[in-house]
């Protein structure tokens, strides 16, 4: 997971991480392994017509007034870095804590996770909203998730969790990335229905369209998958995900590493029927890659046509191919996404089908078969000149294992390498590990690398409409010691969020951010006077000119 961890949990034995034999970690790793890390529209599904050509991003708007990048006589200084965590719903790994909670309980738990994100100085959250052919919103394409309702009958919980989650994330100035598993249809038994159609919700699409379903692997750990090689199944899962894009004000569409399933020894994915019908003489491995490529390309194009400001990104397995297999590959010796799960991640970047990529580098620095310090530069070189942002998937779940992961500084050191190589963000797996803070590792890297707030890095391919310079008109201390500002909007496009700077020596540093409409404050102004400036940002993170200074 984000299906990621499961992804790594399914590595071949030579890359399987060592396990610390404590009850907590055993439970986490078990859950990770399981990850593999409304009514339907009609009984017969007709795929939609091809998506129109993607809308091109308009040229950047240059607003008038204010100063660009300066607070009075000094430059402003802000870190541009995506910071987030995966909030995993399948098997109730992170959230909700158990199935069948009341609306009030679910909401309270979610708000605590957002409080954690704010305390970590994150600016995004990645929420698992389609874990297994189900939904955390009222959907015409999928049953309600049993991990939310506690039932497998598809009945509504009577409220809309997605609307609540998006609104509350935005209220805290967190981007909301909706995390989907496109092809996974069920979880294995005994907790999930496995490959037993009789245990599916009555409105599960695979019950209506059994020709779309493939069971894999054989035996007790079987799941049902939407067949990636069936064009009607592919169109359906695209429509199911785009329903959420259409209905909700999300900031990103996010996939993890699960496309074709990770291979089981001695068992090939049983897609003979669709290969015979649609393969058209293409070698099966290439045909499978083509199927996944088509999903990725079509999702990119359809998101652009529907809401061009919504980001599209994928968090793949951390190895594309090994150099021993392909000279373009990485200096590694592990499972290969290209060959083993038919995910040509390198191609997706080079073709510009993604806005960001989050490779799961869940190995330690110095690990011989997959060295973090060697894989990181491979990925940074891949994205150069493409416009695709590189964020790294960090393996917080491994902290506390034997060996290198018993060092609380392991992720701290990895983030130092990320900064050295110009990585533009990190996403941590998973939320529960950040809350538990084993060995104090999370506190350590937060204090070293996330000590100050950060702005989301803008993307040139997205629409740009930076607002005009706002105004700081007054400031006063409240009873809690915060400095509260009175502001006025600038001219031109409306700001989506704000950034507050305070002059410190020869620069003005970022001290706080917030959503437009929220109170502008400096939470720790100190006892003496200070000089401040304010800016507005558009939806894509483009900053407008800075206000005139206000000294208080």
Residue ranges of model-derived segments:
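Aromatic-lined carbohydrate-binding/catalytic grooves of carbohydrate-active enzymes
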Residues: 120-157
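Substrate-binding cleft of secreted/luminal carbohydrate-active enzymes
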Residues: 342-368, 379, 385-462
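Active-site-adjacent "subsite" loops/lids of carbohydrate-active enzymes
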Residues: 80, 88-108, 178, 183-243, ...
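Catalytic domains of carbohydrate-active enzymes, especially glycoside hydrolases
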Residues: 108-134, 247-252, 347, 353-354
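Beta-strand-rich modules
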Residues: 522-543
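Pro/Thr/Ser/Gly-rich low-complexity, intrinsically disordered linker/stalk tracts
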Residues: 445-492, 541-552
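Aromatic- and acidic-residue-enriched segments that line the glycan-binding/catalytic groove
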Residues: 135-150, 184-219, 257-280, 324-335
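Glycoside hydrolase catalytic-domain groove-lining segments
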Residues: 277-328, 335-402
